[in-house]
Curated annotation (Swiss-Prot):
A motif (DDXXD motif) lies at residues 300-304. One of its GO terms (biological process) is diterpenoid biosynthetic process. SUPFAM superfamilies: Terpenoid cyclases/Protein prenyltransferases (SSF48239), Terpenoid synthases (SSF48576). Its cofactor is Mg(2+); Mn(2+). PANTHER family: OS04G0344100 PROTEIN-RELATED, TERPENOID CYCLASES_PROTEIN PRENYLTRANSFERASE ALPHA-ALPHA TOROID-RELATED. InterPro entries: Isoprenoid_synthase_dom_sf (IPR008949), Terpene_cyclase-like_1_C (IPR034741), Terpene_cyclase_plant_C1 (IPR044814), Terpene_synth_N (IPR001906), Terpene_synth_N_sf (IPR036965), Terpene_synthase-like (IPR050148), Terpene_synthase_metal-bd (IPR005630), Terpenoid_cyclase/PrenylTrfase (IPR008930). Sesquiterpene synthase involved mainly in the biosynthesis of germacrene D. Produces exclusively the (-)-enantiomer. Highly expressed in leaves, stems and disk florets. Detected in roots. The keyword Methyltransferase does not apply. This is (-)-germacrene D synthase. Pathway: Secondary metabolite biosynthesis; terpenoid biosynthesis. Keywords: Lyase, Magnesium, Manganese, Metal-binding.
Length: 549
């Protein structure tokens, strides 16, 4: 048997080991935790009163929008979800599409983000008689930034907003160049905005960028600033505790010994789940999603970077049966993966059943089976040397991107807000999930194309390969096309987040946040597979370095 095993030619990916070691294994609670929690409660009341006062006074409705924007960007909106919803609903009910206050782009962005489908016609006032944006707009840097950010909430056929990114980027880049010498704070802010608009940013990452900028503003609200810093540190402590508990679970796998071929990215898996929801009330859901992310990585590398065709067939059949009676039929290295996968879902199923919501895990399990089945289809293509058509690839890649399965997993443990109808909706391949999966698949395939082509043992044909072969074009042509299609998919995502009534906005935000994380990981290169300084610094900012108060 040993000689036969040695004869097996396996793919070889040579992934680098984890960069974190056991850094997050031990958690120590801050000594001043209770005192900080009391301070936070007092500051929350101050801010809550400010929101109520501004809401009750129509002349202060523009100030109200500014305050809500600051609360959101400082990363403390989760303290005031009810107040923000009440305020924005009042704004929408009062003005409809005919906003009378200032900061029209801010009004547009905040209401669309909240799910109110306000018209983009308000931006007609920004155009001159020739249909071009007024040059006078370029004299107001903050107004240009607001217009730039609003444009990324657009949907298809909103021509005025399609023109806005080019106009604003051009002039903001010039402002950036001109401001370098005298306003480094503003320069950094513009640079960050041009790198990634708010719509594509993870809220917690945005807060890390915005807090230092906000602190430099002379007019900043001291209560807001202090609350944002204390709140950040409180949550960081909670997240570190979660990661410590999760790390103990992960150590049980002994990856270096039992699954040495996989990318050991457990800290990055947790950070990914943190991107979906960082708020304290979703701790249980976040812990479960982290474990699902870990299995998704494990399975991806098993199917793509180690397993041979016959082994993968056996494993896929075992997953379809979902029974420990299949364990003996599996190759030795797959037994641990299979058993732990079933145990994870069974444990969560028991927990949810006690709460009267057994359907949570039932649908998550179906999504996992479908996900693994799509990997098997791709393994078959690779085994047969088959390059599928673009249409064939798209049908399978929608599932193999993992984002449908992960979206459904992200609902598990969120409580009553995730109804059985929500799970049925997600499993039915709705347009909102299709848009997210398209963004994930295309961005991943573009950055991974060249690297994976060099892998020993080959790699399944990606969507880039399929399009190149079918249309006889270069890879650079496909990269440019896919980047355009990603922007189109964002328009689909924006529209569906506005018109989809089957699930509440709080569930839609899980999907939107997961999509934002793709932009964080795969904008220029695959920073999940090849963890570099930028991602390391980002994770340290979230999970290592407390914020100075």
């Amino acid at each position: 048997m040993a000689s036969r095993e040695n004869e097996i030619i396996r793919p070889k990916a040579n992934f680098h080991p984890s960069v974190w070691g056991d850094q997050f294994l031990v958690y120590e609670e801050p000594e001043d935790q209770v005192e900080v929690e009391k301070m936070v409660e007092g500051l929350k009341e101050e801010v809550r009163k400010e929101i109520v006062v501004a809401l009750d006074n129509p002349s202060k409705h523009t100030d109200l929008l500014v305050l809500i924007n600051e609360v959101q960007r400082l990363g403390i909106a989760y303290y005031f979800e009810e107040e923000i919803e009440r305020a924005l609903k009042h704004i929408y009910d009062t003005y409809g599409d005919h906003w009378k206050g200032g900061s029209a782009p801010l009004w547009f962005r905040l209401l669309r983000k909240q799910g109110y489908y306000v018209s983009c016609d308000i931006f007609n006032q920004y155009k001159d008689n020739t249909g071009s944006f007024k040059e006078s707009l370029t004299n107001d840097v903050h107004g240009m930034l607001e217009l730039y950010e609003a444009a990324y909430m657009r949907v298809h056929d909103e021509v005025i907003l399609d023109d806005a990114p080019v106009f604003t980027k051009t002039h903001l880049a010039k402002m950036l160049k001109d401001s370098l010498g005298y306003n480094p704070t503003l320069s950094k802010y513009i640079q960050d905005s041009l790198e990634r608009p708010i719509r594509k940013r993870l809220p917690r990452v945005d807060a890390l960028h915005y807090i230092p900028f906000y602190e430099q503003q002379v007019s900043h609200n001291k209560s807001l600033l202090k609350l944002s810093k204390l709140g950040f540190n409180l949550l960081q402590s909670m997240h570190k505790k979660e990661l410590s508990e999760l790390f103990k679970w992960w150590k049980h796998f002994d990856v270096e010994k039992n699954i040495p071929y996989m990318r050991n990215r457990f800290v990055e898996n947790y950070f990914w789940a943190l991107g979906a929801y960082f708020e304290p009330q979703y701790s249980r859901a976040r812990i479960f999603l982290t474990k699902v992310f870990a299995f998704a990585t494990m399975l991806d590398d098993t199917y793509d970077a180690y397993g041979v065709y016959k082994e993968l067939e056996i494993f896929t059949q075992a997953v379809e049966r979902w029974s420990l009676t299949c364990l003996d039929a599996l190759p030795e290295y797959m037994k641990l993966i299979y058993k732990e996968l079933l145990d994870l879902y069974e444990e969560m199923d028991d927990t949810m059943a006690k709460e009267g919501a057994p359907y949570h895990v039932k649908y998550a399990k179906e999504a996992m089976k479908e996900f693994i089945g799509s990997y098997m289809t791709e393994a078959r293509w690779k085994h047969e040397g088959y390059v599928p058509t673009t249409e064939e690839h798209k049908a399978v890649a929608f599932i193999s991107s993992g984002y449908k399965m992960l979206t459904i997993a992200s609902f598990v443990g969120m409580g009553d807000i995730a109804s059985e109808d929500s799970f049925k909706w997600a499993l039915s391949n709705p347009p909102l999930i299709k848009a997210s999966c398209s963004i994930c698949r295309m961005m991943d395939d573009v950055v991974g194309h060249k690297e994976e082509k060099e892998r020993v043992g080959g790699h399944v044909a990606s969507s880039v390969d399929s399009y190149m072969k079918q249309h006889n074009v270069t890879e650079d042509h496909v990269y440019d096309l896919f980047n355009t299609l990603v922007e189109d998919a964002w328009k689909d995502l924006n529209r569906e987040s506005l018109i989809c009534k089957e699930i509440p906005m709080v569930l839609k935000m899980r999907l939107i946040n997961l999509t934002c994380f793709i932009d964080t990981l795969y904008k220029y290169e695959d920073t999940f597979t090849n963890v570099g300084p930028e991602l390391i610094d980002c994770i340290k900012s979230h999970l290592v370095h407390a914020m100075s108060v």
